[in-house]
Amino acid sequence: MMKLKSNQTRTYDGDGYKKRAACLCFRSESEEEVLLVSSSRHPDRWIVPGGGMEPEEEPSVAAVREVCEEAGVKGTLGRLVGIFENQERKHRTYVYVLIVTEVLEDWEDSVNIGRKREWFKIEDAIKVLQYHKPVQASYFETLRQGYSANNGTPVVATTYSVSAQSSMSGIR
């Protein structure tokens, strides 16, 4: 199923969820700093770069394309962290790790909509995401659990469902 957006065709899975892809863009393989971008809707808020998949596009290809458009970075695509479901917004997002190897001075969203980017330590990224993007904050928790659950070998997560109400209850 597809729906036309101003600049792209949206694709949906069999359950009617929008198919999305995103990357946790790390400065190095140590995965200590991650790149976030300003939201197009709320420029004072930070988000994980990602977006809708195009028809017939593989999730990994969409993830790399989206981070180049939104964050102006290229790199080495790594493991799939998981497939995250946002029940409130009806999205399913494939989230990958990307180790940044090239940072573009000017990129599509910086030129077109003035999007900004900034490096964050993981704990700080979680803090800035947890209130307005709890599903995105959960990407980092899953990343951590993947390492600890298998002695440093990442465990590929299946679908995670986070509703705004359940995720906010754990925040103090």
Swiss-Prot record:
Activity control summary: Endopolyphospahatase activity is inhibited by NaF, NaPPi, beta-glycerol phosphate and heparin. 5-diphosphoinositol pentakisphosphate (5-InsP7) inhibits its mRNA decapping activity.
Residues binding Mg(2+) 2, per UniProt: E66
| Note accompanying the cofactor annotation | Binds 3 Mg(2+) ions per subunit.
Its EC number(s): 3.6.1.52, 3.6.1.61, 3.6.1.10, 3.6.1.62
> What Pfam families does the record point to?
NUDIX
Keyword Ligase carried by entry: no
> What InterPro entries does the entry give?
DDP-like_NUDIX, NUDIX_hydrolase-like_dom_sf, NUDIX_hydrolase_CS, NUDIX_hydrolase_dom
Q: Catalytic center at which residues?
A: E69
Residues given in the record as Mg(2+) 3 binding sites: E66
Return the similarity comment. Belongs to the Nudix hydrolase family. DIPP subfamily.
Can you say what this protein is called?
Answer: Diphosphoinositol polyphosphate phosphohydrolase 1
Q: Which organism is it from?
A: Homo sapiens
